[in-house]
Amino acid sequence: MGKGILSLQQEMSLEYSEKSYQEVLKIRQESYWKRMKSFSLFEVIMHWTASLNKHTCRSYRGSFLSLEKIGLLSLDMNLQEFSLLNHNLILDAIKKVSSAKTSWTEGTKQVRAASYISLTRFLNRMTQGIVAIAQPSKQENSRTFFKTREIVKTDAMNSLQTASFLKELKKINARDWLIAQTMLQGGKRSSEVLSLEISQICFQQATISFSQLKNRQTEKRIIITYPQKFMHFLQEYIGQRRGFVFVTRSGKMVGLRQIARTFSQAGLQAAIPFKITPHVLRATAVTEYKRLGCSDSDIMKVTGHATAKMIFAYDKSSREDNASKKMALI
């Protein structure tokens, strides 16, 4: 399948070297056009999304299946037919889908639109420009993309809830209790902690070094300092092992489903009024660091967020708790 798609980009034969540039361009375009009839849109989407990370792959495939379900797209059409569509009109139609047709939120519509644009960009490159790139609207009253909320939806625990959650989690699973503390202190994503290797830990300095990949290219190294008491528990847990820090009984890396289950269970046992997910711990870390008076730049050095806007989005402290509450200027 992959080789079939790549055949769209076959090199031109040397027999055309005597022709003019315009003649060669025309021949090449005709060659692409004929080959495009051999590929269905469904085949192309499956091939393309397989090269993306799991989350994006699942999201994009779901988007196109949803677009077909409401009649905005047919995955059975070939690439010739797809190239003749007015992609900008389809983007507009995605944003104007009525609630009577589907219960998409504004955020869902924007995800669907982003998926569609990404597909046209991929095919534009594969077909040497025959498939046009869908252009998002930037008009004030009909923007394709805009921020739907000031802060993220994820809840955050207060200090008492955090202590209660950790207490209950330790009863359920001591290893997952260590995982939760690793995430909290560093404001880390679950994937960053679950993939952690023992070689990244320095027990003498009580630090753990995390690597973040930005756009799959630029590596960002973040060093988090942990309390000595925690490092003692962690060292006892690891013993003489090598490899991943947190492992199952069979020595494999702990999965996301495992901690999602135990975190949720601990939250219930601690009587926390919202579901505790791994991402709640990241929001909790940002909120707690802000409450303790840390600057945005200091928190960014811990969490790895690229901008202060993201820190603001994760900060769940009251918007009334600002400088005007602490001092009067008049």
Curated annotation (Swiss-Prot):
Coiled coil: none annotated. Residues 39-124 form the Core-binding (CB) domain. GO terms for biological process: DNA integration; DNA recombination; establishment of integrated proviral latency; symbiont entry into host cell; viral genome integration into host DNA. The active site is at R189, K214, H279, R282, H305, Y314. Keywords: DNA integration, DNA recombination, DNA-binding, Plasmid, Viral genome integration, Virus entry into host cell. GO terms for molecular function: DNA binding. Residues 152-327 form the Tyr recombinase domain. InterPro entries: CB, DNA_brk_join_enz, Integrase-like_cat_sf, Integrase_catalytic. PROSITE patterns: CB, TYR_RECOMBINASE. pGP8-D is required for growth within mammalian cells. Belongs to the 'phage' integrase family. This is Virulence plasmid integrase pGP8-D. It comes from Chlamydia trachomatis serovar L2 (strain ATCC VR-902B / DSM 19102 / 434/Bu).
